[in-house]
């Protein structure tokens, strides 16, 4: 069953745009935008299952230069 989620990202100071740009090139990330507020970037992702979501967040998103913290909200 496909899984869709929003990844809320806190980035290093001045890195929001480059983080969003880097994330937009990651397979599974449908869109990523710098935003204002508590989080600096919001990404929308779609993957085939929860295991792939976990891998995407831990191995692809959290390793992008400038990413400090992530919070994942799975769409229901």
Listing of model-derived features with the role each one plays in the protein:
Residues 1-76:
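A compositional/biophysical signature of low hydrophobicity enriched in polar/charged and small residues
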């Amino acid at each position: 069953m496909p899984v869709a989620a929003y990844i809320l990202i806190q980035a290093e100071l001045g890195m929001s745009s480059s983080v969003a740009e880097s994330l937009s090139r990651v397979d599974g990330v449908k869109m990523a935008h710098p935003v204002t507020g508590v989080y600096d970037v919001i990404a929308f992702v779609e993957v085939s299952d929860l295991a792939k979501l976990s891998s995407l967040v831990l191995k692809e998103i959290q390793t992008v230069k400038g990413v400090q913290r992530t919070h994942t909200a799975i769409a229901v």
